């Protein structure tokens, strides 16, 4: 196909996108508040669902999970000769072979996690490749030119890279894919992305440039000066996205920009990953601003300019995992969250039959005689009668926290460091795997690690809230237990009830989500405000009894039950996933009194996922379990540098440690 055809295709695609009326019309999802989707409060998940629903069926009709594909675009960069990366240029070819032969990259592991089909395309790999039958050959040239000395490519090559992405989108859409997860592999591509971000977001080289593959301080200084030189030599025109791509970009970045254009034309959504896909999206949005209606965010990358990129694209990330890797890592996790949210909406549809035969799809309940006849199958109900041997307030105390298995943690971290990726590039995903290794005593915790969800409440959740809790828990393969508190019980009884409920589940579950169900977001917000004020008054030398009695009366029983459950589960060597403000606040109180509990407690919403779920009822904890599943896929499915024959780091903290 001729260069003229490439240019014509790009122009026609842009024209088609511009001629379409914006599907969002500039309004909030479904015309409601940003946290609502079809009347269901889903926090930050609603802005993920709404664009997909609009793209799929105009926001009407039954919503189905999309067929997903991960496309890794590979190309080399001439600017690599300026020594701006921790890895040699031939790593691009080696990783391409890894995707298709050894299948041991994070792209392989997380595509499997997200149930996304993996494709790999060669846009401009310089080094020789072994026979790779599954490789999509779209080579434009053997790498770009050194952009520190002049334009990275010709305008014709820039158009070719965009047209290639459009054609790939057309091909994949024809095969039924409605959700694209682009990723990229190209040594020194964060240098190109920094130059793009500086051009289109009006950033200085210092603001735009980060450590990429975790380079040393000295090499970072070099990289910043190289970006400064790239911008000075080329003077890219921010009003012309093609000019920016031509002068400072890369073939794989142009292809991803084209994929975004093609997806928008085909009414498919693209889940952006990190810094590099964000830079490619800037190019696409510069050419056709309406593509933003088809872009979904995933995470905030470790690169400093990524925040400015997301702001320019009007996207809000839903997690900060400190990733510095671009193989559709964060987007794979968010694609799984999208599936979970769709399953929940399906469960809430009145005419859809409930899924049968799944233990994790039911809420287990044991009824007290006064509460017989409710819908939920089984729950734990706090005894109402005060017995002679009932626990007394004076007996309240936290159990002794166990120690993590440091040997297993060290072995787990050592293996993660040797996996074929830049060292520490998977950020908090690595932290989760190592933490779970310490809990279980296994250097490689199993993909089938058992889990459960424990939901406390003072009254049964509404049918819709119960449906949502069940759907998200089923997605995480976590059986749900509802524990109903008795408002007439003492603080000591509530503590003992919570402790017993958690211990009964933690005996064979290394993972336990704990939630306190509120009936409304407003009630949850009021509860959170009370907790926030109370936490300021807690002192490290307080006793548990003094702490509980210092709380407002409205918080005492829930605090007692949650304290019992959280400490009881942790004492059983279980990793506790805290679901909402109430559980996180109770955990903070425990951490103040007994800091040794902290390694067993995961604050899902405040530390990992920006979900804006107030009355979560287990949703956040369930998604936290899926985050751990992603970490387990990383730890179990990825392969080492030695197993994949990929070059190790020659600079930065990975030098001498990887292998």
Walk through the language-model features, giving the residues of each:
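N-terminal loops that bind phosphate or other acidic moieties
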Residues: 2-366, 372-383, 387-659
